[in-house]
């Protein structure tokens, strides 16, 4: 949790006084609040006046429905750490068409925004079960404004128009309108926060919450903030703080601990009434610290800061952000919306007929594809990536017996070029999968991108009928699993390196049907040895030069059996090339079998027999054997650098310790 930088006793005294305060009966301010409430769409009657001055604590029943509507726009944000597998979490909410608001200390740069995943609907349903979530990516190139954490600590960033799986538009979640005018609440009135505390399911804090201090006209810096008593935790950063009319009053930003000076050093009061030095207390669980209040950034000040930043010379203007400012300041409402309405979006429940139509549409498989120019500029596999040049292999006679390469629109050859990898596809209608793939890996520049919802796309450069899609994989009568998984030939993370935008492009490129092959689910999800070969060889060849070029593909055989019109491979192969610090090339070849599961496919029961990761299922083999079996012809440099010296038929691998490779 971010900690308030205001640490003086005066603030503590003002907060304490605010906890006991009742709303002032100032006719002018009262009228302002009633006008705000009416504009927000919450409804106004005589009881509202009594509620605003603290005489009664009743609200209309539509308060609950409007709260549910508001909650749709609130999301959980995940930002992977620069290194390792850890992540930072926060809360955010939609504030306009395709615009998200959170804290700067959650997303502080466009680079972080590109890595982030935004998840809507991570919450429990009426029966206590998790709902299906929807994930989106951010697009800071379409709009990005931020203020540092030691200033107003906010980030406004554009979000993609459609979800990762392409099935849900962001407009389905509505948005929470920001109003730059003041007068929406008063000290002593109630506050509500919708949040994802500790990255958990969506929660609402609505009991015993009051606004306890509102700005400070005598101090311009403090005047940017508002203080309130409410339960929050780590992960709540970036949450929306509401009035009873569900108007956003401020952006949750920090906690205010109960501070004491002891022997000239700052201590914090803990919930057990003891104290601890601030440097220790800041690392304690939030429920161990006695918090005086929470601190939020006032929306009026936030919008004013956005206006100032976008007006600065050289700032990259965004239509989305310009429209936000125009709407929030009352100049021009968002197109198609009612001015001032605080919650914008579709109703909670559609008409029954519409629900049936929507459900039927969801049941129909969606065929995802990219625009024709989507892959323009992709360089693909580079033969000069390693110090020793390694060209793409060619298709020999044995390979061409199983089909011919698919013709690629706009290419002089038959190579599909993606970000950091290439694919040559077999156009045989009984195969429709890669002859081989080739990828360059730079382990020193790997980027930790979280895996989102797997959505596979058809490549527009090759006719769709030459690509195996969902029709090969789904609706199989095997309990809880499809018998064949969509298996990556180029591993998802292998090409994900370099500058964030490039790494994300590479990640997305791996989800092309051209890079997919049918792999028995137990093999695909459990083959730790097979999936870990690249990592092992990268980091066991040279400490500094962690680069590799990897070739992989299915082994086509005459005795492959047919499933749904496609001949299923029984084996997959892989050739890995690395260099040491002296630029010496080393290669090694491997095969893995799913033979037990690709013959006599038993869809009436789960498969039994040896798991493909057990001894005898993974083999290290001579590169020459892979060439002989596949008909994929590699350059002489690959053959002569083979580190394997065992039997010509290969050697079974039990663990990576059995691999014959150049030792450091």
Swiss-Prot record:
Keyword terms: Plasmid
Single annotated GO MF: nucleic acid binding
Family annotation (Gene3D superfamilies): Extracellular Endonuclease, subunit A, Trypsin-like serine proteases
Database matches in InterPro entries: DNA/RNA_non-sp_Endonuclease_sf (IPR044929), Endo_G_ENPP1-like_dom (IPR001604), ENPP1-3/EXOG-like_nuc-like (IPR020821), His-Me_finger_sf (IPR044925), Non-specific_endonuclease (IPR040255), Peptidase_S1_PA (IPR009003), Peptidase_S1_PA_chymotrypsin (IPR043504)
Paired cysteines (S-S): none
PANTHER family the UniProt entry points to: ENDONUCLEASE G, MITOCHONDRIAL, ENDONUCLEASE RELATED
Protein name stated in the entry: Uncharacterized protein y4fB
């Amino acid at each position: 949790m971010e900690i308030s930088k205001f640490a003086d006793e005066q603030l503590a005294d003002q907060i304490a006084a605010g906890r006991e305060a009742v709303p002032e009966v100032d006719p002018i301010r009262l009228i302002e609040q009633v006008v705000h409430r009416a504009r927000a769409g919450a409804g106004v009657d005589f009881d509202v006046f009594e509620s605003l001055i603290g005489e009664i604590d009743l609200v209309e029943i539509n308060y609950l429905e409007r709260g549910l509507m508001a909650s749709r726009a609130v999301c959980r944000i995940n930002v992977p750490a620069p290194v390792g597998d850890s992540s930072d979490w926060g809360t955010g909410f939609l504030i306009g068409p395709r615009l998200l608001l959170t804290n700067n200390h959650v997303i502080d740069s466009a680079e972080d925004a590109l890595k982030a995943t935004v998840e809507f609907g991570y919450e429990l349903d009426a029966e206590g079960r998790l709902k299906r979530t929807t994930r989106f990516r951010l697009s800071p190139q379409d709009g990005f404004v931020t203020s540092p954490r030691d200033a107003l600590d906010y980030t406004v960033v554009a979000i993609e128009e459609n979800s990762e799986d392409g099935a849900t538009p962001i407009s389905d979640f509505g948005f929470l309108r920001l109003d730059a005018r003041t007068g929406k609440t008063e000290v002593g009135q109630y506050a509500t926060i919708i949040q994802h505390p500790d990255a958990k399911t969506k929660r609402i804090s609505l009991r015993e919450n009051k606004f306890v201090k509102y700005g400070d006209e005598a101090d311009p810096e403090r005047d940017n903030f508002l203080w309130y008593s409410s339960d929050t935790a780590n992960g709540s950063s970036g949450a929306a703080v509401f009035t009873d009319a569900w108007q956003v009053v401020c952006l949750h930003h920090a906690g205010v601990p109960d501070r004491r000076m002891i022997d000239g050093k700052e201590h914090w009061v803990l919930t057990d009434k003891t104290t601890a030095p601030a440097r220790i207390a800041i690392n304690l669980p939030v429920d161990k610290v006695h918090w005086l209040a929470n601190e939020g950034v006032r929306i009026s000040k936030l919008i004013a800061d956005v206006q100032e930043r976008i007006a600065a010379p050289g700032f990259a203007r965004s239509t989305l952000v310009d429209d936000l400012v125009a709407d929030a300041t009352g100049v021009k409402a968002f197109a198609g919306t009612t001015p001032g309405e605080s919650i914008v979006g579709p109703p909670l429940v559609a008409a029954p007929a519409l629900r049936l139509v929507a459900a039927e549409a969801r049941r129909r498989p969606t065929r995802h594809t990219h625009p024709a120019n989507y892959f323009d500029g992709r360089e693909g596999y580079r033969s000069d990536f390693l110090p020793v040049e390694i060209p793409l292999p060619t298709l020999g006679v044995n390979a061409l017996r199983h089909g011919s390469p698919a013709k690629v629109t706009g290419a002089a050859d038959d190579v599909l070029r993606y970000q950091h990898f290439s694919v040559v596809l077999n156009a045989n209608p009984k195969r429709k999968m890669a002859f081989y793939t080739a990828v360059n890996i730079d382990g020193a520049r790997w980027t930790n991108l979280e895996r989102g919802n797997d959505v596979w796309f058809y490549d527009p450069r090759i006719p769709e009928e030459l690509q195996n899609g969902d029709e090969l994989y789904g609706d199989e009568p095997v309990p809880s699993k499809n018998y064949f998984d969509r298996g990556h030939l180029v591993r998802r993370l292998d090409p994900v390196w370099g500058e964030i935008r490039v790494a994300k492009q590479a990640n997305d490129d791996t989800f092309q049907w051209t890079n997919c092959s049918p792999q028995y689910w137990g093999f695909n999800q459990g083959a730790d040895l097979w999936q870990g070969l690249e990592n092992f060889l990268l980091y066991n060849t040279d400490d500094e030069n962690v680069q590799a070029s990897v070739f992989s593909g299915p082994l086509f055989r005459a005795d492959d059996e047919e499933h749904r019109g496609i001949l299923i491979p029984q084996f997959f192969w892989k050739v890995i090339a690395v260099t040491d610090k002296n630029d010496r090339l080393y290669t090694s070849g491997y095969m893995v079998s799913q033979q037990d599961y690709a013959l006599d496919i038993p869809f009436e029961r789960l498969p039994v027999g040896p798991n493909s990761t057990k001894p005898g299922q993974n083999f290290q083999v001579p590169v020459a054997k892979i060439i002989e079996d596949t008909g994929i012809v590699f350059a002489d440099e690959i053959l002569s650098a083979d580190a394997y010296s065992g039997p010509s038929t290969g050697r079974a691998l039990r663990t990576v310790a059995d691999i014959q490779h150049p030792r450091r």
